[in-house]
């Protein structure tokens, strides 16, 4: 297979399909999504068998347990995948909505219309459910998509792709509106990110190495986040019970997600009241604590052992594991300075009962999501009311934070007149 010619053909077909999707009605798009859901259910056994092939190959190739877990489509995960698709049907269609329409002194009306981006390339690893999520969000937002999943999920992705094509045909939409790259050759990724004439934006989902490579090499705009080094700061005026509950959940509710807290900052004024109890809870859950000198000394005096010395690199690390960096800070100035220096710009939280300090934290912390008295684990498109999300962006232009339907669109200016001429 000539990869360059193959990817160019996918790009040409996607560009042509994107024009049909841009003019597709909401009912046609919803009909396609419903038909895809029906096809997935009809081919459930075949998809699960294909996934089992991927799992068997993964074990033979030495994939670790975490990757195998992300790769696996259990019956419950399959049902959740289809239900998530059906929830997208119920979301409001953003396309064609005109906002900010106003008369100008000349008599013309000026506003903004929500429009699709065009062709979206999505590059991801392991999880076959991303194939369904990404296809559904792109279709609902009037875009065409080229999906390049990980080689470890090739069989399940191809089985799912056939269901997507079936649903599109049933709705009278081009079955090239969603195309799954059917080669495992890594050169396909290089081609996908190198053709702005066919692809309008790339969304990479995966490990830091993949996203760095895409960001460095792409000739197409990229919506991305490199990692999720999230912080929770317990202020000196925090409610202790609330602080312990939120900080514990932010770390232990799930370890391998990008919105899990990786660094805990505690104000010096409240550290003796909150840190020993919280450290004990973390250790009971099997969390390794890496602390600054003050934190280690405080816990030793409280009779709690096991906290190891934090290195400088720990402050900027996304552990994705039961490991937590802990630092005692002088107060909110120190906390904000630390966060803005080491954070990846994903999600940060403050626990405090002081409204003024909470507002200051919201204003001065430079991340895509900033929270007050809530777990960082809430940084999620579903929790924000976006429905499903295509990913999370820590960039400051276009989409920022969880990227849902609206993040896959743009706006164009519309001008309405009645024979108006400029004098």
Swiss-Prot record:
Keywords: Amino-acid biosynthesis, Cytoplasm, NADP, Oxidoreductase, Proline biosynthesis
One term of GO molecular function: glutamate-5-semialdehyde dehydrogenase activity
Recorded catalytic activity of this chain's protein: L-glutamate 5-semialdehyde + phosphate + NADP(+) = L-glutamyl 5-phosphate + NADPH + H(+)
Statement: the UniProt record of this protein carries the keyword Cytoplasm: yes
Higher taxonomy: Bacteria, Pseudomonadati, Pseudomonadota, Gammaproteobacteria, Oceanospirillales
A GO CC term assigned to this protein in UniProt: cytoplasm
Gene Ontology annotations of biological process type: L-proline biosynthetic process
Highest taxon above the source species: Bacteria
Described function: Catalyzes the NADPH-dependent reduction of L-glutamate 5-phosphate into L-glutamate 5-semialdehyde and phosphate. The product spontaneously undergoes cyclization to form 1-pyrroline-5-carboxylate.
One Pfam family this sequence matches: Aldedh
SUPFAM superfamilies recorded: ALDH-like (SSF53720)
Subcellular location: Cytoplasm
Family: Belongs to the gamma-glutamyl phosphate reductase family.
Protein name: Gamma-glutamyl phosphate reductase
EC number(s) reported in the record: 1.2.1.41
Uppermost EC category: oxidoreductase
Pathway: Amino-acid biosynthesis; L-proline biosynthesis; L-glutamate 5-semialdehyde from L-glutamate: step 2/2
Chief site of localization: cytoplasm
């Amino acid at each position: 297979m000539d990869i360059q010619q193959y990817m160019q053909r996918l790009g040409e077909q996607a560009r042509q399909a994107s024009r049909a999707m841009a003019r597709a009605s909401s009912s046609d798009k919803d009909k396609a999504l419903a038909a895809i859901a029906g096809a997935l259910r009809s081919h459930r056994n075949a998809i699960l068998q294909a996934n089992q092939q991927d799992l068997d190959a993964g074990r033979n190739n030495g994939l670790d347990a975490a990757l195998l877990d992300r790769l696996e489509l259990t019956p419950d995960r399959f049902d959740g995948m289809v239900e998530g698709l059906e929830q997208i049907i119920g979301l409001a269609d953003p396309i064609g909505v005109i906002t900010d329409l106003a008369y100008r002194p000349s008599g013309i009306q000026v506003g903004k219309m929500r429009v699709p981006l065009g062709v979206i390339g999505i590059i991801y690893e392991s999880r076959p459910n991303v194939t369904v999520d990404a296809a559904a969000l792109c279709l609902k937002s009037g875009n065409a998509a080229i999906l390049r999943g990980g080689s470890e999920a090739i069989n399940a992705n191809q089985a799912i792709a056939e269901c997507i094509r079936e649903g599109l045909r049933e709705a009278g939409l081009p079955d090239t509106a969603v195309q799954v790259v059917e080669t495992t050759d890594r050169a396909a990724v290089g081609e996908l990110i190198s053709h702005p004439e066919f692809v309008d934006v790339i969304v990479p989902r995966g490990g830091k190495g993949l996203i760095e490579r895409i960001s460095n090499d792409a000739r197409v705009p990229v919506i991305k986040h490199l990692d999720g080094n999230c912080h929770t700061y317990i202020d000196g005026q925090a409610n202790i019970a609330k602080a312990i509950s939120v900080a514990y959940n932010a770390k232990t509710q799930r370890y391998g997600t990008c919105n899990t807290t990786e660094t805990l900052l505690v104000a010096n004024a409240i550290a003796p009241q909150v840190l020993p109890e919280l450290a004990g809870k973390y250790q009971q859950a099997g969390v390794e604590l890496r602390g600054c000198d003050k934190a280690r000394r405080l816990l030793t005096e409280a009779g709690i052992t096991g906290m190891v010395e934090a290195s400088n690199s720990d402050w900027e690390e996304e552990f994705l594991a039961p490991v937590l960096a802990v630092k005692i800070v002088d107060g909110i100035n120190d906390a904000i300075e630390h966060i803005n220096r080491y954070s990846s710009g994903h999600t940060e939280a403050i626990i405090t009962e002081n409204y003024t300090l909470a507002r200051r934290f919201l204003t001065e912390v430079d991340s895509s999501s900033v929270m007050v008295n809530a777990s960082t684990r809430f940084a999620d498109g579903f929790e924000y009311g976006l429905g499903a999300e295509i990913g999370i962006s820590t960039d400051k232009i276009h989409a920022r934070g969880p990227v849902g339907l609206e993040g896959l669109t743009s706006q164009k200016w519309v001008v309405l007149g009645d024979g108006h001429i400029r004098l």
